[in-house]
């Protein structure tokens, strides 16, 4: 079992191979549901080590941050202790929200990556327009966390769908 720091280092290696400068890992599934997602979609938790339902992780070449809200500060402090992941306390003074952070920290002519299946089209369009001003691009076709997770990733839910 890899440590959080080892998983982040592997993600950084994949980012470098793909030419990605900053990688965004939201907590959503492919239906854009943020809470109560199947284990398969718990990429934020797998990479950061934080098991709380709300939040996202952002990784750059020299920074890894977990954004979450006040309901989870104590839990996050405990679960991130001893890792390279910095707790970013949402709605606290001096903490930039994730989307502006992505825009501000994608370098000129750089590349922001994320799994396009778990980010809303409105966020992707907004990011694309903002990054265009920096001559930067989006890379949305690869789920790099899947590669890091490998064969140990839980399988997609296979239960039958039914009408309530």
Regions found by a protein language model. Name each.
Residues 2-107, 111, 115, 119-164:
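N-terminal accessory/capping or targeting/presequence segment of soluble
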């Amino acid at each position: 079992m890899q440590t959080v720091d080892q998983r982040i280092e592997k993600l950084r290696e994949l980012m470098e191979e793909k030419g990605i400068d900053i990688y965004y890992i939201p907590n959503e599934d492919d239906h854009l549901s943020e809470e109560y997602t199947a284990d398969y979609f718990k990429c934020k938790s797998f990479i950061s080590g934080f098991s709380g339902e709300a939040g996202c992780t952002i990784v750059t070449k020299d920074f890894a941050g977990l954004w979450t809200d006040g309901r989870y500060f104590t839990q996050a402090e405990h679960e991130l202790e001893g890792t390279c992941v910095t707790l970013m306390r949402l709605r606290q003074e001096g903490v930039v929200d994730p989307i502006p952070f992505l825009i501000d920290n994608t370098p000129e002519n750089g590349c922001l990556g994320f799994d396009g299946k778990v980010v809303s089209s409105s966020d992707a369009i907004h990011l694309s327009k903002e990054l265009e001003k920096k001559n930067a691009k989006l890379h949305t076709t690869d789920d790099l966390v899947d590669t890091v997770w490998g064969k140990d990733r839980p399988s997609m839910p296979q239960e039958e769908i039914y009408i309530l």
